[in-house]
Structure formats: structure tokens, C-alpha cells
């Protein structure tokens, strides 16, 4: 019974680490991704060694392994959201008047804002471009929403930013 529990929880840890490692590597953090990969493989080797011993007599080990894998994916995604690693670009399209108001509001929160002229269907617009850490995403979207400014907001993952204001790695 203890073997099943170890397989289940070790697989959760291993797959969660895999999720974090992949996110780190795709965001350019090769060093940290490699370190996590080292521990990930150690855990995997332990799990496989534990699992393969007596698998014919205890085929439920496969179900335990698969369950740990599924739970690990779910928990890994939750961890990745909580860690909010990396950067995002937020584009907010607003009226000309609201563009300057919103830019000032964001700058008071120590956010670098670039204002670009844009053309809507019926009128001129302003597009505000913000490059921020993902950890600030919810805070800034709430700030824009709470300002009661009618904005069209889009978010994009950003791999690398050179220069700019207010962003430190």
C-alpha cells in the first residue's frame, strides 16, 4: 500500500516539476529549467524503478501511476498560474480622452505606458501598450475595470523585453 502512495505522490511532484520546467525554458530561463529537469529525472527514475517491480502481481500500480500523472498535470497548471512567471503585454484600446486619463492612472501605479494613435470604426482611439510582469496582470486589469473607462483589453505572453520602464527581471 505504501508503494502505491509513494508512486502516486511522487508522480504528482514529477509532472508538476515538468510543467514548471517547460514554462521556464519557453520563457528563456534555461539554467533554472535545467536544474529542475535534473530533479525531475531523478524522481522519474525512482518512480519507474518502484513501479516496475512486481507490476504483473499488482497491475493497479499502472492506475496509480496514471492517476498521479493526471493530478500532476492539474496541480502543475495551478502552480504555474500562482507563480505567474514571465512577462505579458497588455494592450488597452480606449477613446482619445480616456487614453490620457488611463495612462496617468497606470503611471501612478509605476507602470510604463506607451500611447499609440489608433483608428476605430467611427472615431480616433488611443492604444495603451503596457509590458509588465505576469504577477501584476490581475491587479492592472482590475485597475482598468475599476476606472470605469470603456476599454478593449488584449493580453499576450512576452518572451523578452529589452529596455523600458519599471520592469526588472
Where are these regions (language model features)?
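Short amphipathic alpha-helical patches
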Residues: 32, 36-49, 62, 74, ...
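A membrane-cytosol interface segment of integral membrane proteins
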Residues: 137-169
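Membrane-targeting alpha-helical segments
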Residues: 1-81
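Generic structural signal for short, solvent-exposed loop/turn connectors between secondary structure elements
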Residues: 1-2, 123-125, 169
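Arginine residue identity/basic-tract feature
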Residues: 21, 27, 107, 134-136, ...
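Canonical alpha-helical transmembrane segment with a positive-inside/aromatic-interface signature
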Residues: 71-133, 139, 146, 151-152
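Short glycine- and Lys/Arg-enriched binding-loop motifs that mark or flank ligand-binding interfaces
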Residues: 64, 68, 116, 159
